[in-house]
Design a protein with these regions (language model features):
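C-terminal structural segment of proteins
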Residues: 1-162
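A short, hydrophobic C-terminal helix/tail in secreted or cell-surface proteins
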Residues: 163-168
């Protein structure tokens, strides 16, 4: 029998206007809360009933998390900045061309208009296209990514604060 996915599980939606309000909501609701950026990935999880949060905290109304800001050390990109904004921003194109090109390769224009840099960097991937199908020696595979002739090193990155260095 096919699963009917005509409705999402019930949840309480909060749309805070500040980082402080969002933090307070997340502290109050703990593991029962889901943080939503652009929402593209979130709604799929909800409709498939894989994720069933009691509370959803939508960051879309927090203006301080949007946009690109030049800093003394480079460029700071807000977590709620759309991928389209990253692609089209003149300074990103000129000084961080690789980032602009990479953002432009994400999905379709419609998804780039809604998807955010923060949401894309923290999404809970479930698609094999986003996973490395080859495992390293430690995981029973036949390659060591940390020790190759090209010195390819696969290190995890923290996405809590993304600051790009200034191009020399």
């Amino acid at each position: 029998m096919a699963v009917i996915r005509d409705m999402m599980p019930v949840f309480e939606l909060f749309q805070p206007a500040s980082v402080e309000d969002a933090t307070a909501l997340l502290r109050e609701h703990g593991d029962q809360a889901w943080v939503m950026a652009g929402g593209l990935d979130s709604f799929d999880w909800f409709k498939d009933r894989v994720k069933r949060p009691a509370v959803v905290v939508d960051l879309g109304g927090i203006e301080t998390l949007k946009g690109n800001t030049a800093t003394a050390n480079g460029l700071e990109i807000g977590a709620m900045t759309s991928l389209t904004e990253v692609v089209e921003h003149p300074e990103v194109r000129e000084r961080y061309g690789l980032l602009s090109e990479a953002a432009e390769l994400v999905a379709s224009p419609q998804i780039r208009n809604q998807g955010t840099i923060g949401g894309n960097n923290t999404q809970d991937t479930r698609c094999w296209y986003y996973r490395d199908g080859w495992t390293c020696y430690r995981a029973g595979g036949n390659i060591c990514y940390a020790d190759t002739p090209t010195s390819m090193n696969r290190e995890p990155v923290s996405y809590t604060h993304l600051t790009l260095p200034t191009k020399a």
